[in-house]
Curated annotation (Swiss-Prot):
Protein family according to the UniProt entry: Belongs to the threonine aldolase family.
Lineage, highest ranks first: Bacteria, Pseudomonadati, Pseudomonadota, Gammaproteobacteria, Enterobacterales
Cellular component GO terms, alphabetical: cytosol
Protein name: Low specificity L-threonine aldolase
Catalytic activity, EC: 4.1.2.48
Natural source organism: Escherichia coli (strain K12)
Keyword Lyase: yes
Length: 333
């Protein structure tokens, strides 16, 4: 089966599984798992931050990030289509009494800082206290302009706001920039990394920041049910991914660009391609039929009027050629 629904469908390689089986473990709730500690230290080293914490999921990592920045009755400014606003069940509001203040992102995925400034609440008892600006990089595949990262950082310093980056696919951004992680994470107070998307681990995310911040995050992780015991088996996959699967993300980007060109040549309405994602408009009338057509040919896609295709380490160029041929045949019916 060729699965292009998301890069969350990736499976651990044989080498990754061997690293997991060989991992020394301990009780991480006590801080005694050497492999978890090694992963956290390595993430902090790569990013130039003081500390990191390993969590089961990206949703929990974002939730803990917000809970560790904001008190009850405070707010974070966030993109209208950001994952930690739109797709995480309102966790910060439900569990933390943290108010989101969404704004529309610009076409390049940035939150215009003049619009952000207009949403910062005055010091008045009628309003929630604005505490945090939350960005997403990459955002729906789009890499935020590097100069914007510095501008947003300086903006938040001037206004006494914290800056968090949902970096579920931050290494896709790193590869696209052609830089080291720490060159961009210097411009945020905290950020997350999802290990189970393009990096190919079966489970796990990281939250990275300064030592005091991560100390608060450890407490919130425990309170929200994320304290794990012998989780070094999972952390070993993360170490393997960070050491072996980052540079190869360029292959996913190249495959997505190649696939976009193939579909354009076939007559498909390719709206855009960024990093490892491409978006194809098929229309309401064709969405279900295309999904069924592809599934019958062992291809899984999200059947919707605008189809998002995501390339990853478990899909080869040869398999993409098969998908392009099927798409061409569908359009020629």
């Amino acid at each position: 089966m060729i699965d292009l629904r998301s890069d969350t469908v990736t499976r651990p390689s044989r080498a990754m599984l061997e690293a997991m089986m060989a991992a020394p473990v301990g009780d991480d709730v006590y801080g005694d798992d050497p492999t978890v500690n090694a992963l956290q230290d390595y993430a902090a080293e790569l990013s130039g931050k003081e500390a990191a914490i390993f969590l089961p999921t990206g949703t929990q990592a974002n939730l803990v990030a917000l809970l560790s920045h904001c008190e009850r009755g405070e707010e974070y400014i966030v993109g209208q289509a950001a994952h930690n606003y739109l797709f995480e069940a309102g966790g910060a509001a439900v569990l933390g009494s943290i108010q989101p203040q969404p704004i529309d992102a610009a076409a390049d995925g940035t939150l215009p800082l003049d619009k952000v400034a207009m949403k910062i609440k005055p010091d008045d008892i009628h309003f929630a206290r604005t505490k945090l600006l939350s960005l997403e990089n990459t955002h729906n595949g789009k890499v935020l302009p590097r100069e914007y990262l510095k501008e947003a950082w300086e903006f938040t310093r001037e206004r006494n706001l914290a800056l968090h980056v949902d970096g579920a696919r931050i290494f896709n951004a790193v590869v696209a920039y052609g830089c080291e992680l720490k060159e961009i994470t210097q411009y945020c107070d905290s950020f997350t990394i999802c290990l189970s998307k393009g990096l190919g681990t079966p489970v796990g995310s990281l939250l990275v920041g300064n030592r005091d911040y991560i100390k608060r995050a450890i407490r919130w992780r425990k309170m929200t049910g994320g304290g794990m015991r012998q989780s070094g088996i999972l952390a070993a996959a993360g170490i393997y991914a960070l050491k072996n699967n980052v540079a190869r993300l360029q292959e996913d980007h190249d495959n997505a660009a190649w696939m976009a060109e193939q579909l354009r040549e076939a007559g498909a309405d390719v709206m855009r391609q960024d990093t490892n994602m491409l978006f194809v408009r098929v229309g309401e009338e064709n969405a279900a039929a295309l999904g069924e057509y592809m599934k019958a040919r062992n291809v899984l896609i999200n059947a919707s009027p605008i189809v998002r295709l995501v390339t990853h380490l478990d899909v080869s160029r040869e398999q993409l050629a098969e998908v392009a041929a099927h798409w061409r045949a569908f359009l020629a019916r």
